[in-house]
Amino acid sequence: MTEYKGFGKRWKVIRADGEIVTLEDGSKWQVSDLMDRPVEFDPGDVVIISQGAPVNPKICKINNLTQNRELTAVLVQP
């Protein structure tokens, strides 16, 4: 299993199909909610993929479908 190289970088969401989002680097992610309300992504949203747990009201859990890793993503306003 190779280490994901996109940690700490800003990635634009280019496609969002329900809980599946595709980032501009081509990686596909499955979004699961950490809060009491659902987290939805739209094309054009920018996310930072992080291995930590940053404090942000729009934190969601995001799963890398290609590497079976559970990570934390912070939604950044474009």
Regions found by a protein language model. Give the residues of each.
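Short, flexible, surface-exposed loop segments at domain boundaries
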Residues: 1-10, 14, 40-78
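Short, basic/aromatic beta-hairpin or loop at an interaction surface
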Residues: 13-28
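A generic structural signal for residues embedded in beta-strands
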Residues: 23, 31, 48-49
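Short alpha-helix capping/helix-loop boundary micro-motifs
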Residues: 28-37
